[in-house]
Amino acid sequence: MRVHVVSDVHGRADALAAAADGADALICLGDLLLFVDYADPGAGIFPDLFGEAAARELIGLRTAMRFDEARAFSRQLWAGLDGDPGQRIEAAAARQYAELFAAMPEPSYLTYGNVDLPRMWDAHLRPGHQVLDGQRIELDGWTFGFVGGGLRSPYRTPHELDEEDYAAKVAAIGPVDVLCAHIPPDLPELLFDTVAERMEVGSRALLDAIRVTQPRYALFGHVHQPLVSRVQIGRTECVNVGHFRATGQPFVLRW
């Protein structure tokens, strides 16, 4: 069995269409939408609405950890925009999702990232797409558990959860061969982004589950340029499957 795994697609419908070439199935660990790209400030929903210069300003404030100023800057921009902000975001997100799900291979097993809008997915799913969150499946004798979303952060992205709610989804899965999540377990070396020069938020519940149940693999994304992309915890190989928007390449899992 050969499965390809991607995360942090962030609008790369072109590469997504070929992501499962040579594989029996695709697993997608979320973050399909592109709101703003730190490496390409002209791309994404935010610059589409407010322009590249505004995106650069927002990125600069966030990178400097000036989150209150970044939020105030965003509020000022939204206040000057015609129409309802929520409707403008959803319209832009719907356009991205339509393109992404049209390119998504079948069969695909998906969970949500922290920048995704789960309520919008159903309208775009194809027959071969299965969304899993706090759920498990079996593929050719191996069990896969899926945990979607992120944890609360200063960035206030759309799909962030409280620790308790996230931990409940991890607990609902139980022991599996492969633990699939958008965010990493709470290990500093997996959470530090070397380009953004900041720590992202990881899950203690995932780390505890790995230590106790010892899956063969723990797969995740979220940190685009991690200090370390793989660590071993007992028998479990923990792997950041990569920033798909940047690389266009899936992680390959065989058994």
Question: What name fits each language-model region?
Answer:
Residues A25, V176, S203-I210, Q214-V223:
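Proline-aspartate-enriched helix->loop->beta-strand connector
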Residues M1-H10, G141-S153, D177-H182, E237-G242:
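Active-site-proximal beta-strand elements of phosphoester/diester hydrolases
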Residues H10-A15, L33-V36, T111-W121, R152-Y155, ...:
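Active-site environment of divalent metal-dependent phosphoester hydrolases
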Residues A20, F101, V170-A171, I210:
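Short hydrophobic patches on amphipathic alpha-helices
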